[in-house]
């Protein structure tokens, strides 16, 4: 199955890029998006409605767990719902699924929520935004500038605002 192979490759990539502390490839990382996996039965409105369907299979759940084993932490809410099917009119009945997540490494999440109000708007996506605030201080970057035997020290802290933390975003991986 393509989805399972893709998630396995992603977990291996995350592990490979982790590096050792102090190495250049040991950078903070955020993976976020629609994983189309409900990691637990509590992440769907009625597990009996999903028996023998995608999103809740043991193989999918193991693939999601592989991302955690690769060194990522779920930083987004682990309860509530982030998706409601339009066709079945699930939103007004709060019959949803939690399938959208942010996973991180090397960052401290200071808060998170699912923006259900955004989902309630006319013409909104069937997914609600998953918002996570991170406490992130960018490392000081130093280097020398060539010229006349002088060295210039440069300092950059572009991520002083937690919303500027480096991210990788994922799309729909159904």
Residue ranges and their predicted role:
Residues 1-8, 48-53:
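Surface-exposed cleft-lining segments at the edges of enzyme active sites
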Residues 4-15, 64:
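Short, hydrophobic/amphipathic alpha-helical packing segments
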Residues 10, 14-43, 103, 126-127, ...:
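Active-site beta-strand/loop signature of hydrolases that rely on acidic residues for catalysis
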Residues 40-149, 157, 168-174:
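Metal-dependent phosphoester-hydrolase catalytic domains
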Residues 160-161:
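N-terminal, intrinsically disordered, basic low-complexity segments enriched in Arg/Pro/Ser/Thr
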Residues 164-165:
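Short hydrophobic alpha-helical segments enriched in small aliphatic residues
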């Amino acid at each position: 199955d393509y989805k399972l192979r893709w998630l396995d490759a992603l977990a291996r990539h995350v592990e490979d890029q982790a590096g050792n502390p102090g190495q250049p490839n040991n950078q903070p990382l955020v993976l976020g998006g629609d994983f189309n996996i409900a990691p637990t039965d509590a992440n769907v409105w009625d597990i009996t409605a999903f028996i023998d369907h995608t999103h809740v299979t043991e193989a999918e759940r193991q693939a999601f767990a592989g991302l955690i084993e690769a060194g990522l932490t779920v930083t987004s809410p682990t309860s509530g719902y982030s998706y409601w099917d339009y066709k079945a009119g699930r939103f007004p009945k709060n019959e949803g699924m939690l399938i959208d997540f942010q996973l991180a490494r090397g960052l401290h999440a200071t808060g998170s929520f699912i923006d259900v109000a955004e989902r309630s708007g006319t013409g909104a996506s069937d997914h609600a935004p998953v918002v996570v605030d991170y406490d992130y201080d960018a490392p000081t970057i130093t280097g020398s500038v060539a010229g006349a035997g002088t060295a210039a020290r440069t300092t950059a802290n572009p991520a002083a605002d937690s919303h500027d933390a480096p991210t990788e975003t994922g799309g729909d991986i159904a």
